Amino acid sequence: MAESRPLSEEEITKIGNPAKPTGEAGSQMLERMNDSHYEVTGWALDFFHFTDTDNILDIGCGGGRTLHRMSERSRRGKLTGVDYSPVSVEESRKYNAEDITSGKMNILQGSVDQLPLPDDSFDRIITVESFYFWPDAVKDLKEVRRVLKEGGQFILVADIYNRDDLPASAVEHIREYDMRNPTLDEFRSYFEQAGFRDITIHLKNGSTWIAVEAEK
């Protein structure tokens, strides 16, 4: 019997489903995303005004590394992760087992269109590389705003946005996975329609990275 060959990264992504990670391929994909999202996330985290007592939410927490990094920046804070993929919830819990055991962190299964969280709960909210797959941009942003405290800070992070010079490979990826990919004007419009204020769009020189920062 011939030995099966290892799956390529592209095959793992297709089987694992970036919109909702599933199965062993999903676990492998999340492990890779913990690394591939590291730099863009670090760039965006510098826009947060962390304090030691923040209540922080990560929507679409994936493999859990962003939660861990924010925990390091808010030593006495409380952190919550939400993801609608059971595989993501499991992997995030594994990655952050120590903080969960101590009671500092909680990771829940849920969707951005109906967050299982009370109103006005969080000082900081972040979402990294998940907005592409949200069901309804404005409605879901309103749901994010609902759980953000008055004066709280929200940052949406993505490594691409709709512009004329996107590589052909990125355009094909967007098409293949039916990803939402707004222009800068569309991003601002979504946030305004959702009721956010003080909207700032950060762009990384020499890249296609974007971080949309706003307050309630």
Regions found by a protein language model. Give the residues of each.
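C-terminal alpha-helical "lid/dimerization" subdomain adjacent to the S-adenosyl-L-methionine
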Residues: 5-34, 153-213
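Short glycine-dipeptide loop
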Residues: 53, 148-154
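A short acidic, Gly/Pro-enriched loop at the edge of an enzyme's catalytic core
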Residues: 113-124
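A short glycine-rich, Lys/Arg-flanked "PGG" loop and its adjoining helix->strand segment in the class I
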Residues: 138-150
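Class I SAM-dependent methyltransferase SAM/SAH-binding core
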Residues: 55-114
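A short SAM/SAH-binding and catalytic strip from SAM-dependent methyltransferases
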Residues: 124-136
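Conserved alpha-helix/loop element of class I SAM-dependent methyltransferases that forms part
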Residues: 35-54
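Glycine-rich helix-loop-beta junction characteristic of Rossmann-like nucleotide cofactor-binding loops
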Residues: 46-51, 72, 115-116
